[in-house]
Amino acid sequence: MSELTALTIAEARDKLKAKAITATELTDAYLSAIDAANDAINAYVAVTHDQARSMAKASDERIAKGEAGALEGIPLGVKDLFATKGVHTQACSHILDGFKPEYESTVTANLWADGAVMLGKLNMDEFAMGSSNETSYYGPVKNPWRAKGSNADLVPGGSSGGSAAAVAAHLCAGATATDTGGSIRQPAAFTGTVGIKPTYGRVSRWGTVAFASSLDQAGPIARDVRDAAILMKSTASLDLKDTTSVDLPVPDYEAALGRSVKGMKIGIPREYRVDGMPGEIEELWQKGIQYLKDAGAEIVDISLPHTKYALPAYYIVAPAEASSNLARYDGVRYGLRVPGKDIADMYEQTRAAGFGKEVKRRIMIGTYVLSAGYYDAYYLRAQKVRTLIKKDFEDVFAKGVDAILTPATPSAAFGLADEVLANDPVKMYLNDIFTVTVNMAGLPGIAVPAGLNGQGLPLGLQLIGRPFEEETLFQAAHVIEQAAGRFTPAKWW
């Protein structure tokens, strides 16, 4: 059965088309793999055995009739942030206990319309707030990778840690994820998978639990660049239910793979050389530059002067929006309810019991920066900085730069329950140092594995593109992937 779960989406698609395998066989292989591994990895918070089998059966019937969709019979995992009709959707928070929506998110509806099969809901940081998948009410996810000669558990990154771990451990063919400040790209880099955060507005946010509405964007995590391109094509669409959704044709992203990057101008931002960055990250970056240079790309030095303000500005804007978005969870209509002596007390008791520590921290920060005395000093200033960050990118792209190459993360995956990071949230927030600028500017960014560190752990590079030019990112990322190879963890679970 493991040979079936080893197939990429592209390989499985071809075998299903040729009737060499059935969707039912493929789905059963994944369900068996999940049942055997999930206690160890904790990637899934709900496994939809019956639904998966009935969807696979329907796929087999459509294939037999010659009516196969673009993702017909491909088994996928869904981050617990996406509404799935009648199925556990709790954003991995205690406050949404037992919530099963009556509607389907646009992203998942698009995937099911193309014939994909749902295996279940994937673990994540609570309300997508975290960089290590340790804030989930359902416990942490373990990275399928381990350092050479060590049995120590590592984090898979966050907030889409369940998505990245499930893809890396072959517990789904691909997964949906979301990215508010790096939540697709950082876990992808930590697990040796490919993750793309599309341009803001390219993929509908309707039916996705909101964290920071002006920053959130859904995208796929997959095993390789081709699979990410295939999933992206099915995910992206115009959606009138999302006012920020953009009416642009969805290109065939897969067709961009294999196109030459000869003459493409790749920018290298000097501000991304941060103090204390490990030598192996700098080495990897140089390797990536060489891969693109060898393929004919032109490498140019660029400056993004406001980069150093991105992280502090992000940790004002995102919590401010979160404090507003999370005000709706009060125990009245759905989810957890803790009784109180009156309605105000019930609200307080429910929110105190329902939200985890990190979520409470961000609600408090957000409420503080939006309060009358501090709005101008913090929130308004952060929004002005955001405009300057966006202008930095616009200036660079106006000079003819096609894409920007940076490291995806400042390190490889770190240990689970790291005491230093647990006691210093700012150190944890620094994990997003290379990724937040992309969300602040609404641009597309892709993380692609480019090598292993000295301990045998995966490291990723990030490519940042012009708005709505995801094709360029797939094109350049494919060049890096072809040169660097693909990376799979040794099985310990």
Swiss-Prot record:
Protein name: Glutamyl-tRNA(Gln) amidotransferase subunit A
Example GO biological process: translation
Subunit: Heterotrimer of A, B and C subunits.
Function: Allows the formation of correctly charged Gln-tRNA(Gln) through the transamidation of misacylated Glu-tRNA(Gln) in organisms which lack glutaminyl-tRNA synthetase. The reaction takes place in the presence of glutamine and ATP through an activated gamma-phospho-Glu-tRNA(Gln).
GO molecular function, one term: glutaminyl-tRNA synthase (glutamine-hydrolyzing) activity
This enzyme's EC code(s): 6.3.5.7
Active-site residues, as the UniProt record annotates them: 79 (charge relay system), 159 (charge relay system), 183 (acyl-ester intermediate)
Keyword field: ATP-binding, Ligase, Nucleotide-binding, Protein biosynthesis
One Gene Ontology cellular component: glutamyl-tRNA(Gln) amidotransferase complex
Family membership noted in the UniProt record: Belongs to the amidase family. GatA subfamily.
Lineage, highest ranks first: Bacteria, Pseudomonadati, Pseudomonadota, Alphaproteobacteria, Hyphomicrobiales
Organism annotation: Brucella suis (strain ATCC 23445 / NCTC 10510)
PANTHER family (UniProt xref): GLUTAMYL-TRNA(GLN) AMIDOTRANSFERASE SUBUNIT A, TRANSAMIDASE
